[in-house]
């Protein structure tokens, strides 16, 4: 055989040709490899290397979306990758021992590596591209209710359904916030348990009605009758109660709610078994299933005498958990175990915590699954077109729960979301805009566009006020179509004035610094990422891990959750995150470092930061050689040191300057090159516009032009740019039309 990697690439291409449900949704696939597999090192680095290739293509001008040519060209993009980690490896890691990679056929040792080195490779790859995730094999199988049927070897693509091969389950989730009374600040336990009971029965019926892709999966699903009941909106519930997601109390409440979820489901399952009998494979798994049920119950009581469990558990804190929730959890598990011992269970598994991405939108959830909120600010797409900016729906109830007055709450929310109106705005308002030459119709158009504007500048452009207004203001087409044109600055507003007006109208998008808000309440509003341009707070990655650990002892399967990390997170942070997860009894975990993929669905910041792709040694060599060009400085001297104590002058162009525009076609693509010159004819700025090449290439060319212009104004000779960039090649390329000296 050519090895597992070649066949994984075949499977990846096959998945790329399949659309989920026959529509435009991408295929969902999980690929898992045991940590002692001979090809494990290649597997770990597979997607990281492919991500590097995709970035190179994107940098060359290909679109960065997942359906674009860049990602379609590389392999490994149609699956989530995970490695299976047994307890033996964790012990080798702790003792800085060796780890053997063994043949699949006869078990012979193919290679011996340091456990620490392999662990670092996993973290490095996850840092670069968010894959692989980690599944803890020993923990998974210690909670296995049906080991007579074999080991649990794999999971579904999101990693919450962990059970025997050739089985399946249907998912259903409840919106926790719908059971919470904001006014009286009470969680309706009776209704919650009633809903859990109904949905357990519904999912059991769905086993009979479901269709399966193969005879083997149909048979396995009938034999074990696994269910996938779960919940969503935990993050919103805690915020509405005025409780921080990353807090001991928050984890105690999450543990109790999850204990009720699974306890009530198994209690109902046992009742059904008393009428129609347990699942067909129950008798051969009875002892193990009752052992697992007993461990679930012990976690509700924090009794710490678990059977067959080799790791610590984050059980419900008996002192912190509210009495009604604690009693509700314990009552559910008392009933589940008592009835199960009498009648068995209709279902081998009952619950998972799924990501609830799509159904969460339909259920009016601010947060999905067990996640905290991603950010406080949302942009809601309107049915009639356009967008409406709304704050997290939980901010108001949370402030009410924390004791803030209605006036204080309104001002805090306005601080976050803004007034979305010119009325009362400092500096930029109806009166000042009229004085600058805008008429009532112009101002009304701007006012109507503000609710969907991310920043105030987005409401001041030719698409909002129209070309006639630009002409009336004597602004040329060349100016207002330029990518860096700012109408407010053109009208004479300073950056400080624009910034203050922006915060008033569009809000800060963070609650940090809000009027009246006490410092001790800030943690209640912490999100997975920094909020807004000025936000600094976010939930530490261990806050995510501990929340998973609080819920895991009460889940039949596992938890699909992303541990969000900031762009600045290190490889060591990821190593620590994965290692701590192993010790807390989490079954499976995945991380995502902001910006680690060139294409991502949500972004918290537009700051580029330094490129993590650069080789430090190569960067150092380039920097040192560049310094030698500046003068007689020793190799290794930095520009900061060379210019210490001096000010590097920038030679600004006059506000009215001459230049020229060159229209050309490169391989049929129209390009405009515009320049600005000093009075002596020296080049001082360039602008590049290219049609029909997408926002990415246009943006890159625009940024390139700005970089060159800044360099020229700081005294970098034009020849240096010419020598550096001559003979570079990338698309679009070909014959040039429009200039007699360039072909």
Name each model-derived stretch:
Residues 10, 14, 40, 214, ...:
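Extended, hydrophobic alpha-helical segments in both membrane/secreted and soluble proteins
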Residues 26-31, 240-250, 560, 585-598, ...:
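Glycine-rich phosphate/pyrophosphate-binding loops
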Residues 226-244, 573-586:
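Hydrophobic/aromatic-rich, well-ordered segments within soluble, folded domains that form packed cores
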Residues 160, 203, 207-208, 274, ...:
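Catalytic alpha/beta core of large soluble enzyme barrels
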Residues 1-197, 202-222, 226, 243, ...:
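Active-site cavity-forming subdomains of large catalytic enzyme subunits
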Residues 1-7, 18-21, 125-241, 363-414, ...:
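Function-dense linear segments that define catalytic or interfacial modules
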Residues 698, 724-742:
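Short, surface-exposed loop/turn segments at secondary-structure boundaries that line and modulate
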Residues 327-342, 603-672:
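Short, Gly/Pro- and small/polar-rich lid/capping loops
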């Amino acid at each position: 055989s050519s090895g597992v990697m070649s066949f994984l690439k075949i499977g990846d291409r096959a998945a790329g040709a399949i659309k989920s449900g026959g529509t435009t949704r991408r295929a969902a696939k999980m690929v898992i490899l045991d940590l002692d597999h001979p090809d494990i090192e290649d597997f770990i680095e597979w997607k990281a290397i492919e991500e590097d290739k995709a970035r190179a293509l994107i940098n060359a001008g290909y679109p960065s979306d997942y359906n674009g040519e860049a990602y379609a060209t590389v392999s490994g993009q149609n699956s989530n990758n995970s490695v299976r980690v047994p307890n033996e490896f964790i012990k080798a890691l702790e003792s800085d021992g060796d780890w053997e990679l063994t043949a699949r056929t006869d078990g012979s040792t193919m290679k011996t590596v340091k456990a620490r080195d392999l662990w670092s490779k996993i973290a490095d790859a996850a840092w670069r591209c968010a894959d692989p995730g980690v599944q803890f094999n020993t923990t998974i199988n210690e909670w296995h209710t049906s080991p007579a049927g074999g080991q649990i070897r794999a999971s579904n693509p999101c990693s919450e359904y962990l059970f025997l091969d050739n089985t399946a389950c249907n998912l259903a989730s409840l919106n926790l916030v719908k059971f919470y009374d904001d006014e009286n600040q009470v969680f309706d336990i009776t209704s919650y348990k009633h809903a859990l009971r109904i949905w357990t029965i519904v999912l059991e019926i769905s086993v009979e009605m479901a269709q399966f892709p193969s005879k083997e999966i149909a048979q396995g699903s009938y034999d074990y009758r696994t269910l996938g009941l779960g919940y969503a909106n935990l993050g919103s519930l805690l915020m509405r109660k005025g409780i921080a997601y990353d807090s001991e109390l928050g984890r105690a409440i999450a543990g109790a709610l999850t204990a009720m979820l699974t306890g009530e489901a198994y209690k109902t399952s046992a009742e059904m078994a008393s009428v129609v009998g347990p699942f067909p494979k129950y008798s051969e798994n009875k002892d193990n299933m009752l052992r697992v049920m007993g461990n679930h119950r012990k976690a509700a009581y924090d009794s710490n005498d678990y059977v067959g469990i080799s790791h610590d558990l984050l059980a419900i804190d008996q002192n912190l958990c509210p009495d009604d929730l604690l009693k509700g959890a314990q009552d559910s598990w008392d009933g589940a175990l008592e009835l199960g011992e009498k009648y068995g269970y209709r279902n081998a598994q009952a619950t998972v915590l799924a990501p609830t991405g799509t159904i969460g939108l339909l259920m009016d959830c601010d947060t999905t699954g067990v996640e905290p909120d991603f950010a406080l600010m949302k942009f809601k797409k309107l049915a009639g077109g356009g967008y409406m900016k709304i704050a997290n729906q939980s901010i108001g109830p949370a402030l009410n729960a924390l004791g803030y007055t209605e006036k204080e709450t309104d001002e805090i929310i306005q601080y976050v979301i803004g007034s979305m109106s010119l009325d009362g705005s400092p500096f930029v308002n109806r009166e000042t805009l009229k004085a600058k030459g805008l008429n009532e119709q112009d101002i009304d158009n701007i006012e109507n566009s503000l609710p969907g504007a991310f920043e105030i500048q987005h409401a001041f452009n030719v698409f909002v006020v129209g070309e006639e207004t630009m002409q009336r203001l004597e602004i040329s087409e060349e100016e207002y179509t330029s990518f860096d044109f700012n109408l407010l600055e053109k009208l004479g507003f300073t950056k400080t004035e624009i910034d203050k007006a922006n915060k008033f109208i569009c809000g800060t998008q963070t609650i940090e610094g809000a009027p009246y808000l006490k410092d001790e309440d800030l943690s209640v509003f912490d999100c997975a990422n920094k909020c807004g341009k000025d936000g600094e707070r976010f939930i530490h990655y261990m806050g995510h891990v501990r929340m998973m650990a609080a819920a895991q002892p009460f889940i039949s399967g596992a938890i699909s959750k992303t541990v969000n990390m900031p762009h600045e997170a290190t490889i060591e942070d990821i190593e620590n995150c994965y290692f701590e997860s192993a010790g807390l009894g989490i079954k499976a975990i995945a991380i995502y470092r902001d910006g680690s993929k060139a294409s991502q669905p949500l972004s918290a910041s537009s700051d580029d930061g330094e490129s993590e792709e650069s080789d430090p040694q190569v960067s150092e060599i380039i920097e040192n050689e560049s310094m030698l060009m500046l003068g007689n400085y020793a190799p290794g001297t930095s520009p900061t040191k060379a210019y210490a104590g001096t000010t590097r002058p920038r030679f600004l162009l006059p506000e009215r300057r001459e230049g020229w525009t060159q229209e050309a076609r490169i391989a049929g693509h129209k390009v405009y090159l515009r320049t600005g010159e000093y009075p002596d004819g020296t080049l001082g700025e360039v602008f590049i516009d290219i049609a029909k090449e997408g926002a990415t290439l246009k943006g890159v060319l625009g940024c390139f032009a700005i970089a060159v212009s800044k360099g020229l104004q700081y005294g970098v000779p034009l020849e240096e740019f010419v020598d550096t960039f001559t003979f570079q090649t990338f698309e679009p390329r070909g014959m040039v039309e429009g200039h007699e000296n360039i072909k």
